Amino acid sequence: MWGRSLARATEMAETFGGRAYEDVDDMFADVDAVAFAVPPDVQAELAVRAAAHGCHLLMDKPVAFTTEAADRVAAAVDQAGVRSLVFFTSRYCAGQAQWLAEVQQRADWNSGYVRKYASILEPGSPYADSPWRRERGALWDIGPHALSMLVPALGPVTHVIAERGLGDTVTVVLHHESGAVSTMSLSLTAPPGSRGDTWLLFGQDDHTSMPDANTTSVEAMTACISALLTEQPGRWHHPCDVHFGRDVVKILQAADEFLQRPPERRAQPVR
C-alpha cells in the first residue's frame, strides 16, 4: 500500500495485511496490478507511472479532471499493453448490468432521465472531508455514474447544455449521436426529503426504469476485480476500460466549461 501519508498507509497495511511503501514507484515495480483511491488529478498522474511499470489499472471515477490528462492515461495503457478498468458501480451490479444489456438491444429509445440527489458532505459522512468533492461538486462526483449508464444506452454524446441550481445542484442536457436527448440532475447537497435516485429511459411506446442495486458496493468491487483478472484472447478489452473513462471525462469537461460561461450566454431571458 502507498499513500500520501505514510502513517495512514502503514496503519492500513497493519490492519489488512501487506506492506506500506514510502516510494510509490517502488510499489509499482513490485506488483502486477494497482487499485486507486486518490483524487482524480493525482490518480491520472500515478496511473501513467503505474502503466509504465507494467501494472494493470483499476481506477476510480472520474479518471481525471481534464481530457488531456485522461488522454495521457489512455495512451500509457495502450503503449504498455496493460489492462484497465474504471469502477462505475452500477456496471458491476448484476441486476443493473443486466438491465443495461437488455435496453442496449433496442434502438428506439428517444430520451433518458437520471436524478441522483445525495448529501455526502455532511458531518459524519466518509466523504465529508473530501476537498475535491467539495470543490468540484456533484457534476464530477456522481455525474460519472449517470453517464456510465446513459451513454451506453443512448449512444455517444455530441454536445451538452448545463445549468446550476441551489447548492451544488447541476442539471445537464445531453444530445446523443442517435438523436436521443437525455437529462441528468445531480446534487451532493440535497435536503433529506429529496434524496434518492431515478433512472428512466423512454421509447416510442413504453418506458423502463433501472432496478435498485441487488448487490453491495463491496460485491460490485469484487466483480470489477474479477473482470480485470479475466484472460481474453488477443487484445484485452472491456466496455468500462480507460477509453470509456476518457469519454466520460470529455462530457464532464464540456459541461463544466459550459457552466463557466457568463449567465447571458447560457440562457435566453423570458420577456
Task: Identify what each model region corresponds to.
Residues 90-160, 262:
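Predominantly a Rossmann-like dinucleotide-binding segment in NAD(P)-dependent oxidoreductases
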Residues 71-90, 107-112:
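Rossmann-fold dehydrogenase core element
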Residues 144-212, 225-232, 255, 270-271:
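Contiguous beta-strand/loop segments that form the cofactor/metal-binding neighborhood of enzyme cores
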Residues 134-141, 211-215, 219, 239:
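A short glycine-threonine-serine/GTX helix/turn-capping micro-motif
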Residues 1-13:
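NAD(P)-binding Rossmann-fold cofactor-contacting core
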Residues 5, 16-74:
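Beta-loop-alpha module in the N-terminal Rossmann-like domain of NAD(P)-dependent dehydrogenases
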Residues 13, 26, 33-36, 177, ...:
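C-terminal helix-rich "cap/oligomerization" subdomain common to oxidoreductases
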Residues 18, 53-55, 80-83, 179-180:
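A short helix->loop->beta-strand "cap" motif at the edges of active sites that frequently abuts
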